Each structure stands twice: as structure tokens, then as C-alpha cells.
Swiss-Prot record:
Major role in the synthesis of nucleoside triphosphates other than ATP. The ATP gamma phosphate is transferred to the NDP beta phosphate via a ping-pong mechanism, using a phosphorylated active-site intermediate. Keywords: ATP-binding, Cytoplasm, Kinase, Magnesium, Metal-binding, Nucleotide metabolism, Nucleotide-binding, Phosphoprotein, Transferase. It catalyses: a 2'-deoxyribonucleoside 5'-diphosphate + ATP = a 2'-deoxyribonucleoside 5'-triphosphate + ADP; a ribonucleoside 5'-diphosphate + ATP = a ribonucleoside 5'-triphosphate + ADP. The gene is ndk. It is found in: Cytoplasm. This is Nucleoside diphosphate kinase. GO terms for molecular function: ATP binding; metal ion binding; nucleoside diphosphate kinase activity. Its EC number is 2.7.4.6. It comes from Yersinia pseudotuberculosis serotype O:3 (strain YPIII). Belongs to the NDK family. Its main location: cytoplasm. SUPFAM superfamilies: Nucleoside diphosphate kinase, NDK. InterPro entries: NDK-like_dom, NDK-like_dom_sf, Nucleoside_diP_kinase, Nucleoside_diP_kinase_AS.
Amino acid sequence: MALERTFSIIKPNAVANNNIGAIYARFESAGFKIIAAKMLHLTKEQAEGFYAEHKGRPFFDGLVEFMTSGPIIVQVLEGENAVQRHRDIMGATNPDNALAGTLRADFADSFTANAVHGSDAVESAQREIAYFFAADEIFPRS
């Protein structure tokens, strides 16, 4: 297996519900190292830019509105096969379909307010990490 980095967001509902620590505990117990993290409140422009690939889809405006509704936590996770393993612990996008014990099964409020975001490929992880973090904000830990 290859050591990878993936990008993760703890969404506004999970921040508001005080689930940050529980989610971080899951990341660490799954073997991820958190090598960059920050809390921020997205502007409409930042959210639209981040989710630009979804522009024109029926859910886009609601997603932007939700993602700007409160603070989020963005982080870079590092570990073996990080992209897929992070997707596995997140669970299905629709929390109604998420397996018990996954982040979305445990912390999501709805399809849009599904607690977490994670990169879907190594290439998108690189792009998403660069959207929120400068190279000097990432601290690999061995």
C-alpha cells in the first residue's frame, strides 16, 4: 500500500453539534495522521469555487448555502491508502445508505448535512488540499 494524503472537511452541522473531537478520534484510531488543520467560515465565493464541478446541478445552490452556514474544519490526513480508507470510514454520501459505525451514519443530519467531505481520488485530494492549504501549512509526521 502507498502512503497517501487526502483532504477532509468536517461540515457545519457536525461542527455545530460538537462532533469535532469524536470525528478526530475516529481518524486517529483508523491510523490517520492529521498533518494540517484549520477552522474557517467559507464565503459564498470560496464555497462556489471549491464545488465548481457541481455548478449547474440541482443541489449546487443548497450545497453552497449549507457550506457557508457556519464554521467548518478542513484537514489533511495522511496514511496508507488514505483516499479509499477515508471514504470507507465516511460511509455512503446519503446517510440513509451509510453502514452503521461510519461517520455519516453516526453524525449526519441529512443528505446535504452529511457531516463530512472527503476526496474521491488522489488527484482531487491534491487539488482540494492546495485550495485550502499552502505547502508551509502542512506538517508531515513520521
